[in-house]
Amino acid sequence: MTSPVAHRPIGGLNAFRILKQFGPLMFLLALMLVFAATNENFLSQLNLFNVARQISITGLIALGMTFVILTAGIDLSVGSLLAFCGMVAAIVAKGGAANTLSLSSNAGQGYGWFAALLAAVLVGTAAGLIQGLAITRLRVPPFVVTLGGLTIFRGLTLTLSGGGPISGFTPGMRWFGTGLVGPVPVPVIIFGAAAVLCHIVLRYTRFGRAVYAVGGNAEAARLSGVRVDRILVAVYMIVGFFSGLAAFVLSARLNSAEAVAGIGYELTVISAVVIGGTSLFGGIGGVGGTVVGAALIGVLVNGLVLNNVSSYTQQVVIGLILIAAVAFDRWLKLRAGT
């Protein structure tokens, strides 16, 4: 007589995996259907272009944040760093000290869009380097270092600008925020190219494998020869770089750099990454999910605005979705027995 063989509930496990992998995409499609049904302007070309541009700016920072969260880190300074890099870019583009620039100053003055772009990404990368070194050399938790960075960069922005905006950029610079290549907005092309590059780096390079290894188990990675501290510094430089790039695109789109730019972006960016399936505990996730997460947040906010939902309620909704995404990730881990 043969004894019955216990089988693992494969169907149920596969259902959980499918839900984790495709859940955000299904939710995004459902949201689009709901908003298309509730507001006739949602699917208009003008609205879709605006949503795509906003998603691209948030998504650029989220790409960098993906690297950080994959190492089980966090960066709360990205919103303030966005404002700081944008202000630096504006000053370089216009030429001169912030307090000498006015809203009516000539758009043709300054050092041009390329110098502004270079300044933004260099400042962002340098900020990431400083924060990464503070985390690895001083052994201060990322939460504390970047929370301090949030305040420091905002203060530097206000000091640099005197609290006022700088606007009136050249058509060449504005093209990066409002231009089209064929039917596609330029920010979408920049975001798409960056997403492809980040995916290749994470999936097909030694550095990418090291990022996952550090997030999975930093001590085991160290024992296997991974230079953990260098990886950690590098990922904070990456998110700093993308914060600078996003700042340049945002300033170009708005034709203005403001000291209050980026407030609340840290929550939006982290939400996009986590909703896309990257675990806050590190080692799990990827670029594809982040792109979907950024799109989901962008569509959600846009749809709520079109349906006259207040900005305060929008923040509540995003916060609840973030909590739900983290709780769901934890539940899946427990379900899988990890």
Regions found by a protein language model. Name each.
Residues M1-L33, A37, V196, L223, ...:
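Cytosolic-side transmembrane-helix boundaries in multi-pass membrane proteins
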Residues T2-A62, A97-A115, V226:
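Membrane-interfacial amphipathic/re-entrant helices at transmembrane-helix boundaries
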Residues P24-A37, M65-T66, V121-G124, L150-G155, ...:
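Hydrophobic core segments of alpha-helical transmembrane domains in multi-pass membrane transport
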Residues A30-N99, L133-V140, G277-G288, L320:
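Single transmembrane alpha-helix segments in multi-pass membrane proteins
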Residues A97-G149, V292-G293, I297:
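Alpha-helical transmembrane segments within multi-pass membrane transporters and channels
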Residues G112-A120, G124-Q131, P183-E258:
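Helix-loop-helix "hairpin" substructures at the membrane interface of multi-pass membrane proteins
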Residues F114, L138, P142-T205, I231-A234, ...:
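Transmembrane helix-bundle core of multi-pass membrane transporters
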Residues S243, R253-G319:
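Transmembrane alpha-helical segments in multi-pass inner-membrane proteins
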